[in-house]
């Protein structure tokens, strides 16, 4: 009898670590994994042709070496879907995305697949709903066996006609599709009104799904962060500085409000976008970037800077090098 008991105990000792290792990480653990991130590939010609890519394999390695933990891949996918074939995503599109996921993962970077079709969805939610749900049906099937370092973000910045009430309906339908094949994969969801910090109370998450990370975006004050941007009414307003005590206190107050919501609802927070347009004075860009990143980290949030290249620039493609002041603001040098 004693021999039998000893045998059973030895078996339990052996299998317990195996069972523990197979338990999925919870959303808070996974949020730590995201850590410090950056938005990539949204407007890169790589989606037209791999031969035209600005972002190369080496950039994944450079991001990791610089101290980043994750990438948020911005996917403008609707143009790559075949209307006459049930909105099927093209093989070339999936091949490109597979390459990016593979190279990011190989370099130890967590990956967020962010459906970035916010403008189209905002203009006509009903007319684009079929595409929206078809996208997640295909992507969730395609990546059902991907490592748990691959995250899904249902939609970037729902806004305008995609109201809080309608958004709560749409994301739940997409989430149900995802959960069919990805029951424990982390899904990132943010509030309507451009993932605004002021609209979290209108986000109605399913209480029984704890594999969700909540995202907010932060560009306040817009007159500073978007000065000189061609798509805004700030096109000709440049030279605006940032960094007074009052301005810092405003950021801190907004983040404290988000953190209070997060504690009340027991949800981790991912600051999915922040930054200042590259026509803002560099010293103020640095102050703003550093302050927002450090304040987010003080609350235990993960974050992703907007963005790697193009505007809000972190990497200068022409010079093939980092914009060092912004890099150091994001990833301070350890002493």
Q: Where are the predicted features?
A:
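Acidic/histidine-rich helix-loop elements
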Residues: 40-57, 77-90, 223-250
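Active-site region of glycoside hydrolase catalytic domains
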Residues: 24, 133-247, 252-276, 298-304
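Aromatic-rich peripheral "rim/lid" segments of glycoside hydrolase catalytic domains that contact
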Residues: 281-335
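Short, acidic/polar
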Residues: 49-65, 132-136, 251-257, 288-293
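Surface-exposed, active-site-proximal loop segments in enzymatic domains
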Residues: 46-51, 77-95, 116-131, 284, ...
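An active-site-proximal structural segment forming one wall of the substrate-binding cleft
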Residues: 60-69, 88-117, 122-151, 167-181, ...
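Bacterial N-terminal signal peptides
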Residues: 6-17
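N-terminal carbohydrate-binding accessory modules
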Residues: 20-72, 87-88, 261, 327-329
């Amino acid at each position: 009898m004693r021999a039998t008991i000893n045998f059973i105990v030895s078996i339990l000792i052996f299998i317990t670590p195996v069972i523990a290792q197979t338990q999925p990480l919870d959303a808070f653990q996974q949020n730590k994994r995201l850590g410090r991130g950056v938005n990539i590939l949204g407007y890169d010609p790589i989606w037209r042709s791999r031969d035209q890519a600005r972002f190369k394999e080496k950039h994944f390695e450079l991001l990791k070496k610089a101290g980043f933990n994750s990438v948020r891949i911005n996917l403008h996918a609707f143009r790559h879907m075949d209307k006459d074939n049930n909105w099927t995503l093209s093989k070339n599109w999936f091949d490109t995305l597979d390459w990016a996921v593979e190279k990011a993962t190989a370099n130890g970077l967590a990956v967020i697949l962010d459906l970035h079709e916010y403008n189209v969805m905002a203009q006509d939610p009903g007319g684009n709903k079929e595409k929206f749900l078809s996208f997640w049906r295909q992507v969730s099937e395609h990546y059902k066996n991907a490592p748990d370092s691959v995250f899904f973000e249902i939609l970037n910045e729902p806004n305008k006609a995609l109201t809080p009430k309608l958004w709560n309906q749409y994301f739940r339908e997409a989430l149900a599709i995802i959960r069919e094949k990805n029951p424990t994969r982390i899904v990132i969801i943010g509030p309507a009104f451009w993932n605004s910090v002021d609209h979290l109370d209108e986000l109605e998450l399913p209480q029984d799904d704890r594999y969700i990370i909540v995202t907010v975006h932060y560009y306040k004050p817009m007159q500073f962060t978007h000065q000189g941007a061609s798509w805004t009414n700030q096109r000709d307003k440049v030279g605006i500085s940032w960094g007074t005590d009052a301005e810092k206190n405003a950021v801190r107050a907004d983040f404290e409000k988000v953190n209070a919501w997060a504690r009340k609802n027991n949800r981790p927070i991912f600051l999915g976008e922040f930054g200042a347009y590259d026509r803002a004075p560099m010293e103020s860009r640095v102050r703003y970037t550093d302050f927002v990143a450090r304040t987010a980290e003080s609350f235990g949030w993960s974050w992703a800077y907007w963005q790697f290249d193009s505007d809000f620039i972190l990497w200068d493609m022409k010079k093939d090098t980092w914009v060092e002041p912004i890099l150091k603001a994001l990833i301070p040098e350890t002493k």
